[in-house]
Structure formats: structure tokens, C-alpha cells
């Protein structure tokens, strides 16, 4: 196990991913949205004191590690952006979709949340199959997988709500 998280740049991240991939070794990767701060490491080497992940079938949460106490009551007040701010971003996305620059977009926006919970408490108690906590810097939790590797191929799947609702079995899919 490494003692501390070691982030690298885009080129080194690509090199590390190619190396692990060519050797058939599983690896964990985390990349910021501009690919300047990247983490590429074998899962068993990640220090659980700085990064925890819990995915179906893969986790580095030590067995028997106690969860943080769940407070009986807590403050959780989302502070979403205004409709006007959201609309400006949506209009940009819409313009680019119609311009042919993309065919699928996951338009997400940061939402501040005023809470008295720690990020670790959010990680421990989130009811989501995909969870990540990074050194009290941020936490991620999601109900869905976005990409899947099967038989050497990478597949992306539309998120719920993006399927054509007119398909005969849309509700079941």
C-alpha cells in the first residue's frame, strides 16, 4: 500500500493505464475534468486513510472498518443554481447538440449543500452502489454505472430517463 495519494498529469496517467491494461492488471483511476490532476493506481495500493471507494464487487473499505455514526437528525439544505443560470448552460448544450458537436450529453451542475455532516459521514451512509470519498476533499455517490467493460470492449450506457419511452419494453429496460 502507498502511504499517500500521488496525483500525476495526463500523459503519465495514460502511460500508467496503458501499462496496467496491457498487463491485464486491474486499476483504479480518478481524473479531474481538465485532466490535469489524475490518479491511476492498483486498488489494493490505495491508502484507505485518504481514499475510499465502494462499488459492486470492488471496494477498498477495510473489512470491519466501523462506519461513522449516523446522526439522528442533520441539516441537508441544497442550494441549487437559479433557473436563469441553468437555462444559460442548457442553451449552450442545446446549441451544440443541434450543431452536431455531440449526440449525448450529461449536463450536470454543481449544487452546494449546507450540511452539518462530514464528507465521510455522507460516504458511509449514502444509499448508492457507487461511492467514493477522497481525503475530506469531496464525496461522490451514484446509483448508476456509466461505462462497462465486457469481453475487452468498453460500452457506455444512457442514464435513466434518456431511453426512448416509445419502445415497447422501455419501462422494463
Regions found by a protein language model. Name each.
Residues 1-173:
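Extended alpha-helical targeting/anchoring segments
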